[in-house]
Amino acid sequence: MDVDVLIEIPKGQRNKYEMDHAAGRIRLDRMLFTSTRYPADYGYIEDTLADDGDPLDALVLIEEPTFPGCLINCRVIGMFRMRDEKGLDDKVLCVPARDPRMEHLRDIHHVPEFERLEIQHFFEVYKALEPGKVVRTEAWADRRAAEAEIEACRKRFAEAAEQGEGGVHGGVTGEAAGEAAGSEPGGAAADGTAAGAAS
């Protein structure tokens, strides 16, 4: 499955940029309280609505960091399942669809184990010094599970848009997500890793 990922935070950054949908601009939300840096380009899949009312998050494995606002056509290869203080907070893992260097990456088990551990460790600790923030990491899921999650989030986005909910996310607000959100999509984990926690 190919998707468009809008990058908010380039690889190697501590600044946490977010798309301000109302203003149509990139806003600096905060600098990470810890000394960690994003291990890959980070953004979201367009026209999706996750359980937390935001677009579905995505990581893009890429050799050179891009820039906030860059749109990348990506191939989905897996997903990291996790939760934060607001609930489900899954991260879809992607690679640029037309990069021959990434041609061998087709599913989560194609990503080296140590690289997956680096990504997992980042999400276990990146909010550790922020008051009131909680993270619980769960496991890696395969490409099929990631694609099922994307389809569920696209359906949720379409349903919320049909309800005529205006707002910041392409006509969909976080409040609309509460009405449109359903149960967590299923999906078998592949190459699962141990759970961790941060607060």
Can you name each region flagged by the protein language model?
Residues 1-187, 191-192, 196-199:
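Hydrophobic N-terminal alpha-helices or hydrophobic patches in metabolic proteins across all domains
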